């Protein structure tokens, strides 16, 4: 996506920090609670990365000194440089904000000694009224789930640039069941039904990265069929995960020791997905049985 700036402001307790986390998942470089005067400098630093940082998202709240004046000045600088930008103003019903503060036990930034949260909310609304009028988008989060907030923010971001997509990260891990299933796995595939190279004395010393073991495993029709079924399943599932708002998918492929069969199958799935997605590969247990094999 072309470089763009996303400014989050609004009422305390309305979801600014959560919105920033969502934008981080969308590939923005994110900074929380930054003074408006520093934003133009931060933009320069981002642009100097030659495209490595394609979007900047910042949270600016009322605690900044000379908030209104410096905020307006920041917006004018961004406009003068013809940088696409959005100002998202978040708000919520008074009772919802009070409930959120009671649940988190955090202190409202404008809460004065002896005052109440409601009084602080009303004071903040007064101070932010002019900023609200500058907003390109105003969102009331009173009845939003996190998923619904994600959907709204994605729509706002794509209105700036239609090519934006979440940074969807896929990690493929081969493992041995004898060492335990990866605790962060979303999908687990058991390949212990495949013939085991461990029982061939000539293949036993090699890992699934070797041509010898790869050739043995992939020569089996059931292995090739299994790989094709997994590819079709992932082609079906991954777009649904993306649509749902997920940004991480951990796929675990296991055999007995995690040295032979799982490594081969994990490699094949990685080779298939890597050209289309941000994909990482980890062979967790490939070296754990080496001392046994010698």
UniProtKB/Swiss-Prot annotation:
Name this polypeptide is given: Nucleotide-binding protein Dtur_1129
Molecular functions per Gene Ontology: ATP binding; GTP binding; molecular adaptor activity
Chain ranges passing through the membrane: none
Organism: Dictyoglomus turgidum (strain DSM 6724 / Z-1310)
Positions annotated to bind ATP: 10-17
Family of this protein: Belongs to the RapZ-like family.
Record-listed GTP binding positions: 61-64
Domain of life: Bacteria
Main function: Displays ATPase and GTPase activities.
UniProt key word Isomerase: no
Signal peptide extent: none
NCBIfam families in the record: PRK05416.1
């Amino acid at each position: 996506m072309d470089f763009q700036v996303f400014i989050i402001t609004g009422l305390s307790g309305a979801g600014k920090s959560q919105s920033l986390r969502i934008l981080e998942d969308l590939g923005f470089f994110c900074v929380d609670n930054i003074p408006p005067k520093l934003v133009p400098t931060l933009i320069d630093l981002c642009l100097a990365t030659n495209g490595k940082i394609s979007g900047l998202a910042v949270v600016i709240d009322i605690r900044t000194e000379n908030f209104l004046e410096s905020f307006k000045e920041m917006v004018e600088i961004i406009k003068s440089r013809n940088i696409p930008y959005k100002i998202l103003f978040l708000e919520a019903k008074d009772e919802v904000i009070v409930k959120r503060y009671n649940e988190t036990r955090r202190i409202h930034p404008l809460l004065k000694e002896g005052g109440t949260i409601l009084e602080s909310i009303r004071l903040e609304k007064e101070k932010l009224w002019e900023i609200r009028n500058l907003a390109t988008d105003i969102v009331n989060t009173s009845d939003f789930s996190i998923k619904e907030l994600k959907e709204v923010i994605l729509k706002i971001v794509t209105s700036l640039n239609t090519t934006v997509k979440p940074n969807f990260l896929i990690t493929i891990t081969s493992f041995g069941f004898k060492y335990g299933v990866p605790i962060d796995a979303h999908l687990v595939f058991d390949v212990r039904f495949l013939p085991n190279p461990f029982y061939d004395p000539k293949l036993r010393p090699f890992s699934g990265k070797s041509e010898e073991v790869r050739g043995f495993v992939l020569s089996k029709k059931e292995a090739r069929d299994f790989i094709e079924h997994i590819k079709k399943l992932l082609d079906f599932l991954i777009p649904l995960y993306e649509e749902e708002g997920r940004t991480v998918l951990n796929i675990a492929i296991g055999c007995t020791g995690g040295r032979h069969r799982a490594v081969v199958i994990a490699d094949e799935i990685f080779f298939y997905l890597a050209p289309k997605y941000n994909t990482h590969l980890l062979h967790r247990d490939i070296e754990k049985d080496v001392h046994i094999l010698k």
